[in-house]
């Protein structure tokens, strides 16, 4: 059943728009599909935040559905939103790419938005987060703070560029560091992720990067109980414990969605693949723990500045 935004949100957002210039752009109504919940405090919550910001800025009706995973459910949701007048539809994840690319031409009056997947239809836009660089600097931080000379990565899938970046960054900071990498093969398998963490801990890892948005919170909570260190993922997770989360690799998908909405509203959006890196404000490093020394933080900041200018990550000579 379709979920309209809670009435109190609608009232507040409409009130905040009073006195503004009436809407005259291309956006009519906006929809968003979520494969899971909007309450995960990570990926889903970020997407929902973007939807709320779009509603507030453009004073338009917005709709969302959670738990939309199967091809049949996706197609039914598209048709439902189309009937409601939605002309900008976000599929919050790569799992929507196949269906959006397939049926996009059947809905020429709609613009479809996906993430981290190839856009193939003329009216499909894909938001890509260039994860290697953020992973690199997260890996540097992990290696710098490790006392056991062992760090770990619990990733969801082998294709995640931030994992390769993390390994390279850890090796750049400390060529002798050991990086233990494991995969859950699912974004949300917190049971498997916590078990993998326990194994890594027993093998000596004292800094772990849980690179999966559906399980990183429970893993970090366990890391905190054990008195070890974590690198946060997707959101700035310093609020989970500033003495636990050394820094975070942040993907501001909400900002990316707002950029796409603004371009669509102005009629300047070019479909296809849009890439966002550390120089865009969409991808960034999160708050550093006070345990991370200032000299290292300043060195990281200089390396990021150089990367933003050259597009090249540092290498050991």
From Swiss-Prot:
<keyword id="KW-0804">Transcription</keyword>
<keyword id="KW-0564">Palmitate</keyword>
<protein>
    <recommendedName>
        <fullName>Transcriptional activator protein med</fullName>
    </recommendedName>
</protein>
<dbReference type="GO" id="GO:0005886">
    <property type="term" value="C:plasma membrane"/>
</dbReference>
<comment type="function">
    <text>Positive activator of the comK gene.</text>
</comment>
<keyword id="KW-1003">Cell membrane</keyword>
<dbReference type="Pfam" id="PF02608">
    <property type="entry name" value="Bmp"/>
</dbReference>
<feature type="lipid moiety-binding region" description="S-diacylglycerol cysteine">
    <location>
        <position position="18"/>
    </location>
</feature>
<dbReference type="InterPro" id="IPR050957">
    <property type="entry name" value="BMP_lipoprotein"/>
</dbReference>
<keyword id="KW-0805">Transcription regulation</keyword>
<keyword id="KW-0472">Membrane</keyword>
<keyword id="KW-0732">Signal</keyword>
<keyword id="KW-0449">Lipoprotein</keyword>
<feature type="signal peptide">
    <location>
        <begin position="1"/>
        <end position="17"/>
    </location>
</feature>
<feature type="lipid moiety-binding region" description="N-palmitoyl cysteine">
    <location>
        <position position="18"/>
    </location>
</feature>
<keyword id="KW-0010">Activator</keyword>
<dbReference type="InterPro" id="IPR003760">
    <property type="entry name" value="PnrA-like"/>
</dbReference>
<comment type="similarity">
    <text>Belongs to the BMP lipoprotein family.</text>
</comment>
<dbReference type="InterPro" id="IPR028082">
    <property type="entry name" value="Peripla_BP_I"/>
</dbReference>
């Amino acid at each position: 059943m379709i979920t309209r935004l809670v009435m109190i949100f609608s009232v507040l957002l409409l009130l905040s728009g009073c006195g503004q210039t009436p809407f005259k752009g291309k956006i009519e109504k906006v929809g968003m599909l979520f494969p899971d919940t909007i309450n995960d405090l990570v990926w889903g919550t970020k997407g929902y935040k973007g939807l709320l910001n779009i509603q507030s800025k453009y004073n338009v009706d917005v709709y969302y559905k959670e738990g939309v995973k199967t091809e049949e459910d996706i197609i039914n949701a598209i048709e439902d939103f189309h009937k409601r007048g939605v002309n900008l539809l976000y599929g919050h994840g790569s799992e929507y790419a196949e269906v959006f690319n397939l049926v996009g031409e059947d809905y020429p009056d709609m613009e479809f938005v996906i993430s981290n997947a190839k856009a193939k239809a003329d009216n499909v836009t894909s938001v890509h987060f260039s994860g290697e660089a953020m992973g690199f600097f997260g890996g540097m931080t992990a290696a710098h703070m490790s006392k056991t000379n062992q760090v770990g990565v619990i990733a969801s899938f082998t294709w995640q560029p931030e994992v390769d970046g993390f390994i390279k960054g850890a090796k750049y900071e400390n060529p002798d560091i050991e990086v233990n990498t494991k995969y859950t093969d699912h974004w949300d398998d917190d049971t498997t992720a916590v078990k993998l963490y326990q194994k890594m801990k027993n093998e000596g890892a004292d800094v772990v990067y849980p690179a999966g948005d559906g399980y990183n919170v429970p893993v970090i909570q366990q890391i905190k109980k054990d008195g070890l260190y974590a690198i946060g993922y997707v959101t700035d997770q310093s609020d989970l414990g500033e003495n636990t989360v050394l820094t975070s690799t942040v993907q501001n998908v909400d900002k990316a969605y707002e950029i796409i909405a603004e371009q669509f509203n102005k009629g300047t959006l070019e479909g296809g693949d849009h890439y966002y890196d550390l120089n865009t404000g969409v991808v960034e490093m999160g708050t550093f723990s006070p345990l991370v020394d200032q000299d290292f933080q300043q060195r990281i900041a200089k390396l990021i500045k150089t990367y933003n200018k050259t597009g090249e990550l540092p290498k050991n000579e």
